[in-house]
């Protein structure tokens, strides 16, 4: 345990003061708003961009300068008039600004880390891409046997998130402001029935940052244990850090297994218990080449360690151990499974020829069409059966504006899901968006889709719904013939840093 504490102390060696004065600077809110301005038609709070203005920010900063408004009385909720009648808008503005501020220490830490290793800042756009995980899965998961499917729970109390951030930020005023937000809205964050409304939708970036910082705290310990496991591969979880017994256990294992015929088949558990861990938000996956007993030991150890040292309460039904051969797991809007790719090799020796059937394991990644149809139905692009419908829009939006919004959604979706091995599902989603756009325009002009397309022509829709193939041809015109075969295969773009809105059909944090 002392080694773990020293490890964490090194990670927390950089702390930053005086972040609280930045809350009173107008440019902070401008940066925060510009960074999150690219909201699509699927935005949970479309009115926020229309109501945002520098005048409102100045008025909010003036109210924050009056310290008596920050006094919170637990007995009389009406006494605190800090947010006033515009509490939802003010709350979101403060939340986005505060989220931008508290990310500064982590950004500085990343820059200093890169400078320390290479004496210069490295362009790490590809390393930030969340889709870079799928080439990793294709390269490493094909030879694994078991997968541990984990749904990480919320912390039991908001103060845990504040204490986690306190390791990095020593500014007490900023931490008090964070307590102000969490204490008033904690129930709406952890209650499933309330998690889809109110505070969470308006302040999602802030809470995701706090949650990820807390998860990274115990994931750093997990990385430490994984590094130490290279010396302790056969040690049970109860004495996982006691190196003194390691070699003795190895000798006893050899004495036991040497009497078994399949000694080499069993000894690999001691030599190479390959483990891979990936996570996005609350979804985590731990894959291994070991046996069910080996994975159960990891499960018991991690649950016990996280509950005792990080106050995370895991329910047994949140963690599943499945065989990769007959189980598909969902991650980042994709569904991945391990399938056998048959191949036939013809071998000829003199006058005799033989056909040798080989089966190669391959990770197959595709789009789960049914959850996406449900997500499109909730966003009013289609009904539950997948039939496109017109989407209600504001009357002051022009036709080109509506087309641009639908086109942006379609192109982003194609860009995000270009790695799918089943293109049929991708084409179906494009068809729904294309026809929904046509019906939306026809509804605006109070006519039918057929009449609208005859009057304006189908080119109106085709010019903004460029397929990935067209984009590749426009980017590489000289290699258009060779790119035809490339487009039929999967393409992973390494410039995507957030999950697609439509792909995130699961309940968010």
UniProtKB/Swiss-Prot annotation:
GO terms for molecular function: RNA binding. GO terms for cellular component: chloroplast. Coiled coil: none annotated. InterPro entries: Domain_X, Maturase_MatK, Maturase_MatK_N. Keywords: mRNA processing, Plastid, RNA-binding, tRNA processing. Its main location: plastid. It holds the Pfam family Intron_maturas2. It is found in: Plastid. One of its GO terms (biological process) is mRNA processing. Usually encoded in the trnK tRNA gene intron. Probably assists in splicing its own and other chloroplast group II introns. Belongs to the intron maturase 2 family. MatK subfamily. HAMAP family: MatK (MF_01390). This is Maturase K. It comes from Castilleja linariifolia.
């Amino acid at each position: 345990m002392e080694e773990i504490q020293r490890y964490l102390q090194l990670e927390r060696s950089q702390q930053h003061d005086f972040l609280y004065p930045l809350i009173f600077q107008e440019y902070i809110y401008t940066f925060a708003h510009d960074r999150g301005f690219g909201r699509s038609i699927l935005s949970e709070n479309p009115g926020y961009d229309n109501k945002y203005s520098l005048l409102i920010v100045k008025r909010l900063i003036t109210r924050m300068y009056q310290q008596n408004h920050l006094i919170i009385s637990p007995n009389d909720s009406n006494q605190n008039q800090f947010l006033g009648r515009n509490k939802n808008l003010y709350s979101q503005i403060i939340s986005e600004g505060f989220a931008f501020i508290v990310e500064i220490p982590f950004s500085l830490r990343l820059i200093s880390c890169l400078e320390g290793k290479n004496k210069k800042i490295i362009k790490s756009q590809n390393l930030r891409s969340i889709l870079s995980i799928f080439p990793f899965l294709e390269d490493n998961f094909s030879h694994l046997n078991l997968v541990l499917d984990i749904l990480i729970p919320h912390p039991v109390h908001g103060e845990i998130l504040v204490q986690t951030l306190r390791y990095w930020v020593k500014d007490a005023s900023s931490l008090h402001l964070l307590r102000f937000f969490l204490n008033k809205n904690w129930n709406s964050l952890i209650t499933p029935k309330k998690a889809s409304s109110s505070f969470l939708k308006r302040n999602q970036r802030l809470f995701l940052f706090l949650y990820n910082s807390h998860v990274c705290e115990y994931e750093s310990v997990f990385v430490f244990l994984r590094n130490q496991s290279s010396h302790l591969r056969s040690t049970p979880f109860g004495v996982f850090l006691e190196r003194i017994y390691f070699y003795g256990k190895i000798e006893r294992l050899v004495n036991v297994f040497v009497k078994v015929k399949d000694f080499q088949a069993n000894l690999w558990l001691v030599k190479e218990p390959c483990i891979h861990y990936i996570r996005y938000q609350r979804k985590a996956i731990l894959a291994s080449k070991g046996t069910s007993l080996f994975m159960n030991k990891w499960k018991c150890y991690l649950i016990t360690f996280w509950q005792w040292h990080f106050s995370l309460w895991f329910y047994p039904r949140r963690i599943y151990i499945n065989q990769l051969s007959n189980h598909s797991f969902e991650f980042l809007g994709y569904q991945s499974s391990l399938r056998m790719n048959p191949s036939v090799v013809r071998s000829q020796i003199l006058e005799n020829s033989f056909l040798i059937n080989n089966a190669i394991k391959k990770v197959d990644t595709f789009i789960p069409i049914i959850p996406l149809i449900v997500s499109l139905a909730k966003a009013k692009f289609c009904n539950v059966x997948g039939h496109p419908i017109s989407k209600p829009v504001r009357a002051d939006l022009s036709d080109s504006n509506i087309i641009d919004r639908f086109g942006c959604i379609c192109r982003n979706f194609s860009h995000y899901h270009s790695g799918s091995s089943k293109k049929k599902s991708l084409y179906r989603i494009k068809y729904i968006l294309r026809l929904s756009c046509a019906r939306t325009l026809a509804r605006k002009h109070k006519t039918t889709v057929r009449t609208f397309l005859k009057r304006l022509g189908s080119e109106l829709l085709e010019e903004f719904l460029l397929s990935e193939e067209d984009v590749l041809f426009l980017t590489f015109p000289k290699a258009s013939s060779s790119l035809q075969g490339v487009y039929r295969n999967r393409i992973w773009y390494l410039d995507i840093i957030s999950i697609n809105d439509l792909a995130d059909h699961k309940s968010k944090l």
